[in-house]
Structure formats: structure tokens, C-alpha cells
Amino acid sequence: MNAQYILEQYKSAIHERDVERFVSIYDPNVHIYDCWGHWESKGLAAWQENVTEWFIGLKADGEILKVDFQDVVIEETADLAFAHCAVTFAAHKESDGEKLRQITNRFTFCMKKVRDTWLIVHEHSSLPISMEDGKGMFGLR
């Protein structure tokens, strides 16, 4: 297993709205800076709470997310890795697949190997901010 595998697990667990599988790729002491709703999440329990709320909302709205990674750069050593990329989240109606909306965020994932398994120990998502109005710029990609 390499660090790329973690990104594929991230992508498929979101699409399947599988909370347990999604949080299984994170270290118990993960520290996340998220650009949605919460400034940060410290520890797996806090992150799992946020993810559960997110996936429940998707299910209630009858939506699935398709995740796509662009411009992925991964640096990997024997026990540490980092990846940075653009991540597009496209919401689709579960019933007929109609695309509803999409956004692209910038992401950095920092991983460490624990007992031959890569785990995300730090994640940072961001958007550029408009200098004119101070709002996140969603449509640049």
C-alpha cells in the first residue's frame, strides 16, 4: 500500500457515504483545518462527528458526491508522506445522477505509516479569498 491508496479510499468512502471507512484512513490524533463550517477538528472523535453530520445531510438530501483529484503531487518516504492537490466535489442526485453543483478546494494531506498502514495525521483544505469582498473564490477551477 502506498500513499496514493489513501486518496483512493478517501474518494470512494465519500462517494459511498461510509463514515467508518472514511475515518479509518485517519490517525486517532488527526488535526484538520477545514474550510467548511468548523475552523478545525482535533482528534478522530471530533472529525468523525463532523463527517457523520456531513454524510447524514447528503443522504437526507438524496445526494452523492463524486470526488476528483487534480494536479496530485505526492512525496513519500518509508514512514512519512505528503500530498497536495486540487479536489473537486461534485454533488449529484442519487435518483438520476443529475449534477447539481460542484466546488474545488485546495488540499494538503500529511500521512505517517503506522504498522504498515498509511494514516492521515494532518489535513488542510482552503480556497483563495477575493481581495474585493473577502469571500471564498469557488469558481477558479
What are these regions (language model features)?
Residues I6, V19-D79, A86:
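A solvent-exposed, acidic/Ser-Thr-rich amphipathic alpha-helical stretch
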Residues G97-E98:
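Outer-membrane beta-barrel domain signature
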Residues Q102-K135:
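Short beta-strand edge/turn micro-motifs at domain boundaries
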Residues V67-F69, H84, Q102-F107:
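Short, surface-exposed coil-to-beta transition loops
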Residues G139-R141:
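Extended, polar beta-sheet/loop recognition surfaces of beta-rich domains
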Residues C85-H92:
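Generic short beta-strand segments
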Residues Q9-Y10:
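Generic hydrophobic alpha-helical segments
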